[in-house]
């Protein structure tokens, strides 16, 4: 009989311990959760202002009325390097049709980014997110990640990973103003 009571006590203690750990984990997880909401298709793209390689400010809301091909990338990222020349070629096709590229480099030096842009002969605006605040606001992971923003400023599509030139042309057509 004493053994049965001891077993019940042990089982109850084990259950209470598991519940306590689950509660503590839930509280900790909620307290440390990312303060930014996950963005999705149909959401308004959060506004930001970043500076390009020429020192010129680019504010996302200034592009309202145009389609924006918002690309997050790094010079060390092989898929980014592969898609950049195709993005530049499509930029030449679509820039006069109301579609703009805004390429957001993630926290690298101006020197590294300028060298990369010169190496690939890129003509579209490249801005640097030195504090990673824009990357965090958009919950960017992995690189490259591209958001297609329609002329109304809403996210139309989120593309994670490398794109082909055919994909890029199709996506730019998709956000081209009527």
Where are these regions (language model features)?
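Conserved redox-active cysteine motifs that mediate thiol-disulfide chemistry
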Residues: 64, 72-89
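Structural microenvironment flanking redox-active thiols in thiol-disulfide oxidoreductases
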Residues: 81-120, 130-137
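Thiol/disulfide oxidoreductase modules built on the thioredoxin-like
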Residues: 115-123, 128-176
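Conserved hydrophobic/aromatic "anchor" residues
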Residues: 48, 63, 72-73, 116, ...
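Hydrophobic beta-strand anchors of alpha/beta hydrolase catalytic cores
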Residues: 69-70, 101
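A short beta-strand-turn-helix
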Residues: 47-68, 91
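N-terminal targeting signals for export/organelle localization
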Residues: 1-44, 171, 178
């Amino acid at each position: 009989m004493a053994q049965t009571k001891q077993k019940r006590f042990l089982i109850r203690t084990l259950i209470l311990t598991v519940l306590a750990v689950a509660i503590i984990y839930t509280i900790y997880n909620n307290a440390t959760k990312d303060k930014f909401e996950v963005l999705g298709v149909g959401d308004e793209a959060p506004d930001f202002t970043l500076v390009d390689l020429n020192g010129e400010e680019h504010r996302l809301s200034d592009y309202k009325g145009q389609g924006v091909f918002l690309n997050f990338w790094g010079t060390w990222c092989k898929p980014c390097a592969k898609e950049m020349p195709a993005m530049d070629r499509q930029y030449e096709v679509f820039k006069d049709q109301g579609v703009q590229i805004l390429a957001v480099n993630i926290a690298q030096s101006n020197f590294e980014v300028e060298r990369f842009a010169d190496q690939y002969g890129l003509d579209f605006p490249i801005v640097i997110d030195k504090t990673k605040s824009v990357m965090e606001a958009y919950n960017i992971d992995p690189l490259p990640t591209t958001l297609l923003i329609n002329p109304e400023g809403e996210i139309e599509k989120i593309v994670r990973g490398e794109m082909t030139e055919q994909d890029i042309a199709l996506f730019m057509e998709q956000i081209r103003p009527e």
